[in-house]
Swiss-Prot record:
Gene Ontology BP annotations: histidyl-tRNA aminoacylation; L-histidine biosynthetic process
Catalytic class of the enzyme: ligase
Catalytic activity annotation: tRNA(His) + L-histidine + ATP = L-histidyl-tRNA(His) + AMP + diphosphate + H(+)
Cellular component, GO, one term: cytoplasm
Keywords for this protein: Aminoacyl-tRNA synthetase, ATP-binding, Cytoplasm, Ligase, Nucleotide-binding, Protein biosynthesis
Entry's localization field: Cytoplasm
GO molecular function: ATP binding; histidine-tRNA ligase activity
InterPro entries given in the database record: aa-tRNA-synth_II (IPR006195), aa-tRNA-synth_II/BPL/LPL (IPR045864), Anticodon-bd (IPR004154), Anticodon-bd_dom_sf (IPR036621), His-tRNA-ligase (IPR015807), HisRS-like_core (IPR041715), HisRS/HisZ (IPR004516), HisZ (IPR004517)
Pfam families: HGTP_anticodon, tRNA-synt_His
NCBIfam families (alphabetical): hisS
Gene encoding the protein: hisS
Sequence similarity: Belongs to the class-II aminoacyl-tRNA synthetase family.
UniProt-listed Enzyme Commission number(s): 6.1.1.21
UniProt protein name: Histidine--tRNA ligase
């Protein structure tokens, strides 16, 4: 017989593991709604070009790509931002700005599976489209920080930030084409600094600029006052990037006032090729990889054929976030097992179950044909706290027995007093 298993790099989530994912989803959804964001659900399958156009070298290499029966080249989504951008152009472009959207869904990448890296995983994220202000950037960062605060992780995480506009402006000034810019930034992202500098040297032929690149790429933990000093350098003015440093200074100063823990890393870039300004990642000391990330992508909407529209967003790695949570306690309702002692009690079993489910109890009806002496210890071992026992004699008197399966305390009460009896036995 054929034996089927999960596809490599993908996994099943059962019981408490599934509940943890749903807990993160509901926590994120509740928070995003409180910030004024509306949910968007996009297809898992999109045109390949949607992601390939500005996904970056690494993303293109790891996409699940296939042709359908109409010979269209399609892809399982490797991320969700491009889908949101496409949906915005298709459905929301004429709506009042800014547009605030949030999502939660599965994405797919053909990576080598390892700790913290899967081929199917979940992302929770937001996109704000139509606002280029520093307030928009701060709102997005504040929402991200508050999500981790709700998970009791705000004291552990650090948000790493940079302004990729510094690199973009220099390369635009010297007419380095987009594909080469993408490759250079990809090399920097992979910490292949010397390779990136070699390509820049061949194309810029300007030692001063190469030296400047080298200087900022090595500033991994830059202080606020250093940013202000860098903004005043003559070469910064000459390269027309003073405003990019001043923006980073303003943003960082406000983040400090908001008590959001962050660090400035001028050598930090992100692998996705559509970023134009602020970029950021969430770091946790227990893992070597980021658990969330995002940034500003002011040209993507126009690239997809929409009207020019600034945008910013982030995506949270759900499984990665779960890895860094030491003790996630998902609140569960009280587990109740309803046991009927004869066929005559079946209607009462269902009636009792309906009553308790309306009061948010988790209720299971016993289907095992075994004596009570075996059923009670079995259900106690399965995590049930309360047993409702309905026997023939109780049924005749409209009574039930409520038993605490942990303490073994039990009482018999009229059916209408069932809720009080459960509370009394717990």
């Amino acid at each position: 017989m054929t034996k089927f298993e999960t596809v490599r790099g993908m996994k099943d989530y059962i019981g408490i593991d599934a509940e943890k994912i749903r807990y993160l989803e509901s926590t994120f959804r509740d928070l995003a709604i409180k910030y004024g964001y509306s949910e968007i659900i996009t297809p898992v399958v999109e045109e390949f070009k949607l992601f390939a156009l500005k996904g970056g070298e690494e993303l293109r290499e790891t996409m699940y790509v296939f042709k359908d029966k109409a010979d269209r080249e399609l892809s399982l989504r490797p991320e969700i931002t491009p889908s949101v951008a496409r949906a915005y152009i298709q459905n929301l472009q004429s709506s009042p700005k800014p547009i605030r959207l949030f999502y939660f869904g599965t994405v797919y990448r053909y990576d080598e599976p390892q700790y913290g890296r899967y081929r199917e995983f979940r992302q929770a994220g937001i996109e704000m489209i139509g606002d280029s202000s520093i307030l928009a950037d701060l709102e997005v960062l504040d929402l991200l920080y508050n999500f981790y605060d709700k998970l009791n992780l705000s004291n552990d995480i650090t948000i790493k930030i940079n302004n990729i506009g510094i690199f973009r402006k220099i390369m635009d000034k010297y007419n380095i084409e987009d594909n080469l810019q993408e490759h250079i930034l990809h090399l920097i992202d992979k910490n292949k600094i010397n390779e990136a500098l070699d390509i820049l040297e061949k194309n810029l032929k300007n030692k001063d600029i190469i030296d400047f690149f080298n200087k900022i790429l090595t500033k991994k933990d830059t202080k606020l006052e250093d940013i202000e000093s860098l903004a005043e350098l003559e070469e910064v003015s000459r390269l027309d990037i003073k405003s990019e440093f001043l923006y980073l200074f303003r943003l960082s100063r406000i983040l400090s006032n908001l008590n959001i823990k962050f660090k400035i890393d001028l050598g930090f870039v992100r692998g996705l090729a559509y970023y134009t300004g602020l970029i950021f990642e969430v770091l946790h000391p227990s893992v070597q990889f980021s658990i969330a990330g995002g940034g500003r992508y002011d040209k993507l909407i126009e690239l997809y054929g929409g009207l020019p529209s600034p945008a910013i967003g982030f995506a949270i790695g759900v499984e990665r976030t779960l890895l860094v949570i030491k003790d996630l306690k998902v609140e569960e309702p009280v587990n109740v097992i309803v046991i009927g002692m004869s066929e005559d009690t079946i209607p009462s079993m269902f009636m009792v179950s309906r009553i308790l489910r309306k009061e948010e109890y988790k209720v299971v009806i016993n289907t095992k044909d075994q004596p009570l002496s075996k059923l009670l210890p079995y259900y106690a071992s399965q995590g049930f706290k309360v047993a409702i026992i309905i026997g023939k004699q109780e049924l005749e008197k409209n009574m039930i027995t409520v038993r605490n399966l942990i303490t073994r305390k039990q009482i018999s009460v009229p059916l209408e007093n069932i809720e009080d009896a459960i509370k009394q036995t717990l």
